[in-house]
From Swiss-Prot:
Family: Belongs to the ZIP transporter (TC 2.A.5) family. KE4/Catsup subfamily.
UniProt signal peptide: 1-23
GO-annotated biological processes: intracellular zinc ion homeostasis; zinc ion transmembrane transport
Any one GO cellular component localisation term in the record: endoplasmic reticulum membrane
Main localization, broad class: endoplasmic reticulum
Keywords noted in UniProt: Endoplasmic reticulum, Membrane, Signal, Transmembrane, Transmembrane helix
Name listed for the protein in its UniProt record: Uncharacterized zinc transporter P8A3.03
SUPFAM superfamilies membership: MFS general substrate transporter
UniProt biased composition (Polar residues): 240-254
Lineage start: Eukaryota, Fungi, Dikarya, Ascomycota, Taphrinomycotina
Organism: Schizosaccharomyces pombe (strain 972 / ATCC 24843) (Fission yeast)
Stretches that traverse the bilayer: 138-158, 166-186, 195-215, 359-379, 400-420, 433-453
Domain of life: Eukaryota
Region (Disordered): 229-278
Compartmental location: Endoplasmic reticulum membrane
Amino acid sequence: MFLLQRFFIYGLFLACFYTTVFGEKHFEAEEYRDSFLSQENMNKINHTTIERLFREMTENDPSLLSSSKTLAELSKGELAKAREDLKSVLSFLKNNLPVDTESSSEAFTIEKDNNSCVWLNSVKSFVEKQFSYSSGTNGILATFLTAIPPNIFILLVPKSFDTSMLNLFVAVSAGSLLGDVFLQLLPTVYSTNGGDFPASSVYSILIGALVFFLMDKGIRILIHERPSSLSKPKKDGEETSSVNKPSASSTQTDVKGVEGLRKRNVKDDQNSKGHEPDLIRHVVEEVSEEYNDKTVVYLNLLCDSFHNFMDGLAITSAFFTNTSIGISTTFAVLLHEIPAEIGDLAILLRNGYTKSQVLVLQMITMVTGLLGAIVATYIYTASSSSSPYGSFLLQLEDKLLPFTAGGFLYIAYLGVFPELLEINLSKGKLGNMIYTALYMMFIVGGFSFLYYV
């Protein structure tokens, strides 16, 4: 295997060598060679870049690999140039090949930078071997795996969990989502369209963001839409959840309304002869609390189900594009799901649910994620048929990746970053500044992680 890999690489560089023979006729291929042999780019060589360069060169001019010009027909200048090229290549390979006598026939790792971690490439290679099945099977398997760590994490998180520590996970989630969009999804859309970004892909990104916006807005409307007679004024010191947190203007209006209700209630109590108003008000408050709690729980479950469906769709679509992109999308979804599941845990525990009940509800939402993976598999499989329906699915298939990118952008900028903008008054100014610096570090860390995946 090792000899075959070397033969492939030497053949590639011999193809680069032939670009000097044909002069201006193969000027573009010569640019590939010069770019490839520059020290800055040589430090970024891996199997993917080698295969890409090989494909570009052969597509540029297939005759590069089948030239009839022999070594005797080359001029002294051409031979000198070839020697320098091969000398540079061999020197680079000698300095970067791993020294391992037992597994040298299977290991071929070239560092991206001088101080690059070889173990990271080994981990990536190991993960890719786990997804050696068909694209559809890989997508369903990855979707299932993304649901396991968050549920395990739920069991380990104590009920009194510091929200500032939770926001560190949220920051990693934000960085990973942006990394998946800008380092994986959008470059793939660009490359699959021949170095172009068609208007249909741009609108698909917009549609993806709008779908998540409509879902988010609809849930907010449904949560706050209840009979005004059932509205319950908050007690002093009672905290408001992030889901039902009103804006500043609405808070002022609510305060005035509550004061008016209090004055009216005092007047009613003075004029009444019995305790009937107190009893009625107590019943109304209990009904209001039960109605609001059930609404929050059910709508949160609905939101999670749709979100997991879109995650399954995105992961499987990425695997049908490329295994490496599928793995990076899986990591992005996984890093986002952990803080999201903790947030769901907080909502459900606050409404009286036990951890075991929370896990049952999360299993229900996991099924919707698997359903999304199955739908994506069906779309990509059926699109290969020559029927009009298959043609429609083929067009839909091309829009799934940019649609996913738009959804991830909405989640990152309007779903995740606003949580990081919240100020924790108990930490003080210095504490909030320190946590802000930590958020920046974790965002960059999450983004950089997707660069190496």
